[in-house]
């Protein structure tokens, strides 16, 4: 091993050791939100993942978060919350809630990510969402009904309010 290789190796070990052992400091590494979400008194911790199907980092992180969530005990409640910042985000949030409302197999969410990030179909129109869901035996008229659903609109509005409260950008 050359002296350069040894020096590089030492640098990375030292850097990552310092990074791992560093303590997080309020104001530097994180900040408290003005209106924290209420903490339940039953001892159950709620972990919320905010995501967007079109986000490559979310796609990359999906297997790890699903694996982590599957290993949690009953004292951890894991939920996903699609972001709805703009029109395309809202369409994808509707897609998320359609999949949930119809109780489609959870692997359908992974199929959305694959369709977008591997196949290049970003599902940017209601018609492409209908075509996508038809692969899972959902009739286009059912998808249309759910795309316009009052209940799904309520969920998206609730999520937008919660995202604002959590200061997600």
Question: Where are these predicted regions, by residue range?
Answer:
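General secondary-structure edge motif
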Residues: 30, 35-38, 79, 92, ...
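Functionally constrained cores in energy, signaling, and assembly domains
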Residues: 8-9, 20, 47-50, 92, ...
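C-terminal cap of thioredoxin/glutaredoxin-like
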Residues: 3-5, 134-169
């Amino acid at each position: 091993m050359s002296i350069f290789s040894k020096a590089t190796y030492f640098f990375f070990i030292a850097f990552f050791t310092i990074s791992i052992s560093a303590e997080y400091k309020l104001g530097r590494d994180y900040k408290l939100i003005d209106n924290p979400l209420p903490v339940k008194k039953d001892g159950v911790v709620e972990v919320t993942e905010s995501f967007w199907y079109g986000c490559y980092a979310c796609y990359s992180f999906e297997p790890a978060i699903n694996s982590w969530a599957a290993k949690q005990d009953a004292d951890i409640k894991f939920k996903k919350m699609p972001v709805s910042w703009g029109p395309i985000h809202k369409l994808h949030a509707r897609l998320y809630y359609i999949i949930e409302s119809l109780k489609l197999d959870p692997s359908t969410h992974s199929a959305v990510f694959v369709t977008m990030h591997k196949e290049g179909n970003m599902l940017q129109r209601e018609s492409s969402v209908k075509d996508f869901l038809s692969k899972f035996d959902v009739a286009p008229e059912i998808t249309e009904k759910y795309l316009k659903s009052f209940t799904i609109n309520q969920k998206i509005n609730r999520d937008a309010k919660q995202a604002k409260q959590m200061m997600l950008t």
